[in-house]
Amino acid sequence: LLHTTQTQACKLAVQDIHKRYGDNEVLKGVSLNANKGDVISIIGASGSGKSTFLRCINFLERPNAGQIVVDGEAVKTKTDRGGNLEVADHKQLQRIRTKLAMVFQHFNLWAHMNVIENVVEAPIHVLGVPRREAEDRAREYLEKVGLAPRVEKQYPSHLSGGQQQRVAIARALAMNPDVMLFDEPTSALDPELVGEVLKVMQKLAEEGRTMIVVTHEMGFARNVSNHVMFLHQGRTEEEGLPADVLSAPRSERLKQFLSGSLK
């Protein structure tokens, strides 16, 4: 277990996460600590466990073992008969999840709601923010991600992928989270739209947002993160400062990955 003093400095402490599907162990003890303002990029080949690890942080995937501490508060778990973790207090998890906003690879906007409805839905129904206040804030966040006021009444199907992902980022910001989790936020986008989303993410990093980003964008990992983790076959093979990890890789696997042979 983590010492209290250690967790207080941390916005997020993830300890020794294990996850398996049947006999296939996809995470073999992965840990991460994020202090306020950290931008941590998680890189690795397909199947290395990056997205599974990210989804275990907010229990979208249930880890088989490990501990997650958000802003000094450990997610309460118990062990079931099979020796796997179960959530012990669903109300607590719900509350902790409001501190962890997730931005998905495929945007996950509600198709039947227009842009502003997508952004205000959770603040109104989960946080209890009055509608007018939620809408005012939503407009601020939409402006922050570079979307014009005329977009707010449009439906997701009428927007480009880049616009949809920026709405998804505005929706995450509207929850005023402690930590933002990004699961390959640009990999479903056409190449010419990637830049507009990365620009928004860079702006958030410069504002001091705490961000955990699973990404294939090495430029972002190098220039925006202050820490990079390289996952290989469910373990952290190498981690550290971007300049060290990406410019002077020590492990053969990371050298191969960066040269493109594992991509």
Model-inferred region functions:
Residues 73-78, 82-87, 131-150:
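Conserved ABC ATPase "signature" region
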Residues 155-159, 163:
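Conserved ABC ATPase signature
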Residues 239-240:
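ABC ATPase "signature
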Residues 180-183:
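Catalytic Walker B motif of ABC-type/P-loop ATPase nucleotide-binding domains
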